């Protein structure tokens, strides 16, 4: 009987901790994809002194964004928001 009480208390603790974790995760925006910066063609000739104005996007650029490099890759593109 004592083992049953211990198991039930342990299960309640696990459920309580998992319920607290779910509420913490709701506050985080998981729909935002983490992206890396990249160098557009007009950022300058040297990668060390260039301001990286582009953003790496998988496959093609999203709507409202344009490809800013002349280099073609099958997996990712360097994109930035359209001007104007």
Swiss-Prot record:
Locations listed in the record: Secreted; Nematocyst
Signal sequence annotation: 1-19
Propeptide stretches in the record: 20-33
GO MF term list: sodium channel regulator activity; toxin activity
Domain of life: Eukaryota
List of residues that carry Lysine amide: 83
Secreted among keywords: yes
InterPro entries per the UniProt record, alphabetical: Myo_ane_neurotoxin_sf
Disulfide bonds: 38-78, 40-68, 61-79
One cellular component (GO) term of this entry: nematocyst
A Pfam entry, by short name: Toxin_4
Keyword set, alphabetical order: Amidation, Cleavage on pair of basic residues, Disulfide bond, Ion channel impairing toxin, Nematocyst, Neurotoxin, Secreted, Signal, Toxin, Voltage-gated sodium channel impairing toxin
Function: Binds specifically to voltage-gated sodium channels (Nav), thereby delaying their inactivation during signal transduction.
Family stated for the protein in its record: Belongs to the sea anemone sodium channel inhibitory toxin family. Type II subfamily.
Record protein name field: Delta-stichotoxin-Shd3a
Biological classification of the source: Eukaryota, Metazoa, Cnidaria, Anthozoa, Hexacorallia
């Amino acid at each position: 009987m004592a083992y049953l009480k211990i198991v039930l208390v342990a299960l309640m603790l696990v459920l309580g901790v998992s319920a607290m974790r779910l509420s913490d995760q709701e506050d985080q925006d998981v729909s935002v994809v983490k992206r890396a910066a990249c160098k557009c063609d007009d950022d300058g000739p040297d990668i060390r002194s260039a301001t990286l104005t582009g953003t790496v996007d998988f496959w093609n650029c999203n709507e409202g964004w344009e490809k800013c490099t002349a280099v073609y890759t099958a997996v990712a593109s360097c994109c930035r928001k359209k001007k104007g």
